[in-house]
Amino acid sequence: MLKYDVIVIGGGHAGVEAAAASARLGVPTLLITLKPENLGEMSCNPAIGGIAKGTLVKEIDALDGLMGYVIDQAGIHYKMLNETRGPAVWGPRAQADRKLYKKAMYQILTNYPNLDILYGKVEDIEIKSSKIEAVILNNGSKILCQKIILTTGTFLSGLIHIGQKKIPAGRVDEEPSYGLSNTLKQIGFKLARLKTGTPPRIDGRTIDYSKTILQPGDKIPRPFSELTNIVNVSQINCFITTTTSETHDIIRENLDKSAMYSGQIEGIGPRYCPSIEDKIVRFSTKSEHRIFLEPEGLDDYTIYPNGISTSLPEDVQHKLIKTIPGLENVKVLRPGYAIEYDYVDPREISVTLETKKIAGLYLAGQINGTTGYEEAAGQGIIAGINAALAVKDQAPFMLTRANSYIGVMIDDLTTFGTIEPYRMFTSRSEYRLSLRADNSDLRLTELGMNIGVVSEKRKKIFTKKCEDIEKIKSLLNTLSLTTSKLAKMGIQVAQDGTYKTVLDLFKIPNFNVEQAIKIFPMLKETQNNNILQLLYIEAKYASYLTRQHADINLFQSEEAQFIPKNLDYFKIPSISLEIQEKLSSHKPTTIGVARRIPGITPAAITAIIIYLKTKYSDGSST
C-alpha cells in the first residue's frame, strides 16, 4: 500500500504551493489532482497580482514559493497599479498567457524533489481517533499518510448556474466532489455556501478595437520573483471599453432570469468583485462600468472581458455584450456563469491552518472562504510548511499581522471568520507602510531560511542583496552637496551651510530617485534589484516607519503573551457571561488574538492578563 507523509488534495494555486513547500522541507509529498492540465489552472481571470494581491505574490516568492517565478515565465502585460499614490498601496500585476503559465507550473512540479503527482479523484479521507490515517480514491484504493491538506477550490458540492440552468461541476466540464463535503459535515465542521462567477469569453478577432481605449503595460516589466533577472516573454496591450445605458436596460429587464437575483443561488458572492447584475443594482446611478479586454495568450485569440461576470441566460449574455462599444459584432466563445460551493468556517482552523477538530488535517484556499489565486497560494504555502514541520516534529511556522499580508489574512480568517468571499486589501493591514511589495524578501526570506524552506540559490541571491543594500546605503550617506549648491540646482533646502547626503535629499518633498541620479550619475549603476528605490522609500517615510515600528513592537508584545489551550474562562472573575462564552468559543491563542475578537472589552483583556499572572508564574503556558 502506498504511503506518504503529506498528501495534498487539489492542484490549484493553493495546492501547488502547499505541495511544493512540503517537498522543499524534505518530506515525501503526494499531490492528487484530476488531470495534468489542472496544475496551476487559472479558472477565472488570466492575471496574477494587483493591489495587495501583488504583495501576497511577493511574500510567497520570499518563502521560495512558485507563483512569482511562474508568472515571470508567462507574463505578457506587466503593470504597477496605484503607482501615482504612496508605495504602501502599489500593486504589481501581470497579465498571463494561460498556456505558458500552466506549462511552466507543470514543468516545475513534475521535476520537484520529494514530490509525486497522482492524477485521480479523492472520494473520502480516513480518520481514526481524531487523527488523519489515509485518503480513499474513487476507485476504492487507499493511500496512507500522516497529514492531509485540502485545497479543493470550488469543487466541494460545486454547482454552476447559467440563468435557470444548473450544472453540477467544480469547474466547466469537471465533476464536483460530494464525498469530501459529506465527510466534513459528518466530522462536524460548519459548512456554508459561497458564490463566485466568471464572464463570458469572446473572440478577439471579432472586436472593433477602434472603439476601445488602448491600455499599454509598463515599458520595462518589473519581475515578481527575486529569481528573475529580466522578463523575456513578449509583451502585448490590453484595451478598455464600457457598458452603456442600453446594456443596463437589458440587464434590468432580465434580472428575474439571473440565477443570482431569482433566488436560485444560496451562496453569497464577493462584495468587491461583483457580477454585472450586482453592479447595475447596487450602483444604479452610474451611467457606465469599465470593462478591461484582456488577451488570454500570445497565440490565443480568446479575450477575457474583465468586469462583466454574469449568471444571466446565454441568450441575454449575447444580447447585452453587443451593446458594448467595440463588441457589437463579437463572437461569444463561452458563456459566463456563477458557481456556488461549500466552504468551512475558517474559525475551525488555527493560524497554522490545521483544523482544530482533526489533527493532521489542513485547509487552504477557497475552502476557507477566500477568493483569488493569490489568497489561495498564500494559504497553501503556509499549510504546506506547517504540515511538513509537524511531520518532522518541529515548531510550527506562524506569520503575523506585523510581518506580512499573509499573516493579516490568516489572522482575519481565523479570528473573525467570513460570510462572504474574503479578498485581500491594503486597508486590512494596520502596518501597510512597513508591509510593502518591495521589501517582502527582507521581511520573510530569512524566516524561511531558518526553517529550511528556502533553496540554496535563493539564499545566495538574498545574502548578496542584503550586502548590496548596506553598500549602497553607505554610498548614499557619503555622497553629499552643500545647501548653496543644491539651491543653485533649484532644490529647495534650508540654507544652513551644511552638507546634505542623498538620504537627506530623499526626505525632501517631490525629490525622487531620477533627480538623485541626475546629480550623482554613479548612482545609475546601483539600480540593480530596485535597491535604490527601496532605500528612497525607507528614507522618504522614515518618520512614519519609526512610529509604525513602535506600534508593531506593542503588537508583538501582546502576541507573545500566550493563553493556555485549556484555560477555563468561566473561572475568571469580573468577565461577563457573554464574553466568557465568546472566548470559550474562539479559544484565542494569545492576548493579541483575544483583543481582536469582536465584543471583547479592554477590561476583559486586563482581567485575563491578571488572572494568567496569578495562576501561571511566568504569565504564559502552552
Swiss-Prot record:
NAD(+) binds at residues 269-283. GO terms for biological process: tRNA methylation; tRNA wobble uridine modification. Keywords: Cytoplasm, FAD, Flavoprotein, NAD, tRNA processing. SUPFAM superfamilies: FAD/NAD(P)-binding domain. The keyword rRNA-binding does not apply. It comes from the Bacteria. It is found in: Cytoplasm. FAD binds at G10, G11, G12, H13, A14, G15, V122, S177, Q366. Its cofactor is FAD. One of its GO terms (cellular component) is cytosol. GO terms for molecular function: flavin adenine dinucleotide binding. Its main location: cytoplasm. PANTHER family: GLUCOSE INHIBITED DIVISION PROTEIN A, PROTEIN MTO1 HOMOLOG, MITOCHONDRIAL. Homodimer. Heterotetramer of two MnmE and two MnmG subunits. Belongs to the MnmG family. NCBIfam families: mnmG_gidA. NAD-binding protein involved in the addition of a carboxymethylaminomethyl (cmnm) group at the wobble position (U34) of certain tRNAs, forming tRNA-cmnm(5)s(2)U34. This is tRNA uridine 5-carboxymethylaminomethyl modification enzyme MnmG. It comes from Rickettsia peacockii (strain Rustic). The gene is mnmG.
